[in-house]
């Protein structure tokens, strides 16, 4: 396999330049994170994508700079104290770092959803605020503490630090080794109250119940105070990440990326995800296809929705995968975006080899992929819709006299509004009663509002439905006894309504 490295580097840099001006990125990095370091993106670092997020995306941009500087300086001091032992700690450090980092990314998305919800503060607190805070503490901070203590343990020959698992001892150890500032906003009383169900909610405040020194205690936070606690904790966590990233950039040789190439190993998989990511297009999943296929599956979230851009991105990542994992025989790539339908493109190893030998072969390779039907990528929906409505809308439970419609789902097409649902009629009734209920239910369901679809155009809104598909049962018992089989004693019948001119299915 002949590698045209200049071509490969240029592909990557071109994709990066589409998202952010490279010189501006370096300038912003120097102005906001490290004024001294000088690096070029032609020899790209895998840390570019998380750095981009912390430089340009909210709420990541609100990272605590004092925390970031403190973490960087203390990591640097520990490294200079005992470089050999520091490097030995890196595999364990990276394990905890990535557990924290992936948790953090999920929580950032949850926070964004929290601000878009139209639920009451009470429901939003139960669904989002409390889980966000407890996961910031247990998923992010506790693992970042463990990462730091792994380094301290190795460089100071303190093996007893390796066994600390619970939050309070972790906090005590951090304070003992002068990481006091990292413990601010870590409220163990609130954490214990959430973990043990000691919560009383209203739309104005949250009351936390916990034990302290053997006594029952409580504290109350107004909703705005809880939001402030979450934001401050998030900013501190962000600062810890920036401190680590700054250290990794300054000391690139402490991580031998060539060593971490096994997608089945968590740390290797995590590092590969970073290397297969760009600002705006991030790798979220890497697996080896089970069996003897030697296929690598790569999944991405992306802001790109144009077919030609997705094809080019897929080629860039397939080339990187071929270089880093040369034993694999094929590369299956999918992209996720709220405006895209499910898609994929599959490259064979020989496709990539042909491109690497001669970049002029790209059109031929792409044509071969399309010809053998190894590619399904459709245009993104360009319909102007309320994306938040499409994302968060929940169908209601419709009730009649003695019956309920639940589990309403939208299966509409561009030319037809179609709804399917489950109808529960309650106690055993006569055939005539059941028919009457089905007719009433269809009449009600016909007028049910359906939201737009973010991926493709459908008939939607308050207009009457063209088709209704009802599965009718006696009793609702969550996911039990809802098979559409004659042997299911709870199943009664399947009913379908279509406006005149529409064929039944």
Where are the language model's segments positioned?
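Amphipathic, Lys/Arg-enriched alpha-helical patches that create a basic surface
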Residues: 208-260
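Mature extracytoplasmic domains of secretory-pathway proteins
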Residues: 418-479
């Amino acid at each position: 396999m002949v590698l045209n490295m200049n071509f490969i580097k240029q592909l990557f840099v071109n994709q990066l330049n589409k998202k952010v001006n490279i010189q501006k990125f370096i300038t912003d990095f120097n102005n906001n994170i490290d004024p001294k370091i000088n690096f070029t993106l032609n020899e790209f670092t895998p840390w570019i994508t998380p750095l981009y997020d912390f430089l340009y995306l909210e709420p990541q941009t609100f990272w605590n700079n004092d925390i970031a500087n403190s973490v960087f300086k203390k990591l640097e001091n520990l490294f200079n104290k005992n470089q050999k032992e520091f490097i030995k700690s890196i595999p364990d450090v990276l394990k905890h770092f990535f557990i924290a980092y992936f948790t953090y990314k999920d929580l950032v998305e949850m926070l964004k959803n929290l601000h878009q919800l139209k639920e009451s503060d009470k429901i939003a607190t139960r669904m989002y605020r409390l889980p966000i805070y407890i996961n910031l503490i247990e998923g992010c901070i506790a693992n970042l503490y463990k990462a730091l203590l792994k380094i301290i343990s190795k460089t100071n020959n303190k093996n007893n630090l390796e066994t600390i698992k619970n939050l309070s001892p972790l906090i005590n150890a951090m304070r003992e080794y002068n990481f006091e500032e990292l413990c601010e906003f870590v409220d163990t009383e609130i954490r214990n109250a959430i973990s043990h169900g000691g919560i009383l909610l209203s739309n104005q405040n949250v009351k936390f119940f916990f034990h302290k020194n053997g006594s029952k205690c409580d504290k109350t936070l107004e909703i705005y105070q809880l939001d402030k606690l979450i934001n401050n904790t998030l900013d501190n966590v962000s600062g810890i990440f920036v401190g680590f990233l700054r250290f990794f950039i300054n000391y690139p040789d402490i991580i031998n990326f060539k060593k971490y190439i096994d997608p089945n190993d968590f740390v290797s998989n995590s590092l590969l995800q970073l290397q297969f990511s760009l600002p705006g297009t991030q790798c979220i999943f890497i697996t080896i296809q089970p069996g003897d296929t030697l296929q690598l599956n790569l999944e991405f979230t992306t802001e790109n929705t144009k077919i030609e851009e997705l094809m080019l991105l897929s080629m860039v990542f397939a080339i990187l995968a071929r270089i880093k994992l040369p034993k694999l025989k094929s590369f299956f790539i999918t992209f996720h975006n709220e405006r895209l339908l499910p898609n994929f493109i599959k490259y064979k190893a020989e496709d990539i080899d042909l491109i690497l030998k001669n970049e002029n072969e790209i059109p031929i390779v792409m044509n071969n992929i399309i010809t053998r039907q190894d590619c399904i990528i459709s245009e993104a929906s360009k319909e102007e819709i309320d994306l938040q409505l499409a994302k968060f809308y929940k169908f209601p439970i419709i009730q009649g006299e003695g019956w309920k419609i639940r589990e309403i789902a939208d299966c509409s097409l561009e030319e037809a509004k179609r709804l399917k649902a489950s109808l529960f009629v309650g106690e055993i009734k006569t055939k005539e009663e059941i028919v009457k209920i089905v007719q009433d239910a269809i009449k009600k369901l016909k007028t049910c509002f359906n939201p737009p679809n973010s991926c493709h155009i459908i008939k939607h809104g308050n207009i009457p439905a063209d088709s209704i598909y009802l599965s009718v049962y006696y009793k609702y018992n969550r996911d039990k006894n809802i098979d559409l089989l004659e042997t299911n004693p709870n199943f009664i019948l399947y009913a379908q309504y279509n406006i005149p001119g529409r064929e039944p299915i």
